[in-house]
Amino acid sequence: MNYSDKYEVLWATPIRTATRSCKPIQKYFEFDVIGEHGFQIPKGKEEYFFVLNTRNPYTRMISIYHLFCVHYKLIPNNFNNWIRKKLYEEIKFPGYTLDYEYFIKKRITKTPDLLIRVESLYSDILKLPFFMDNSDELFDIVNDNILKNAYSSGYNYKEYYDQDLANYVYSYLEEDFVYFNYNKDSWKNGTP
């Protein structure tokens, strides 16, 4: 987990939650990088303001599918089969890849002070406690990186999900939906 002693902030960026967009901001503020996707709170930093990036679980599953399958040319027969297999594996090895709310409850007893949602990345980043105290230069850094790595679901949920698969994903990741306040039926309108 990345942190800043100067601002007393911890910032966790789980896999597929805009890490590339947030890293230059962390660099600008001279955060120490302990692990891009790690959840371990460094000793003595337990009381720091805790920022956590999050993403709609439906979109996150599609993004992970593309990361692990398409990018590495390990394309299974289809998303439906792949996600069912991965979620089943998650039962055997909890917290491995898909269910990151698990990490928070099992490894971190601290509730996030600020959620940065991938779907509202720009406006949420502006809520960082140290943001308003800094120069306009930061606006350029945020704009450049958010635009460069712009969140675009780029995915039409209806191409990936039907009611049966959405129910299946929700049944495994219900705690993520509830904890991070994402709508169970968000896949129905096609995009998050």
State what each model feature region is.
Residues 1-192:
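Membrane-interface amphipathic segments in extracytoplasmic regions
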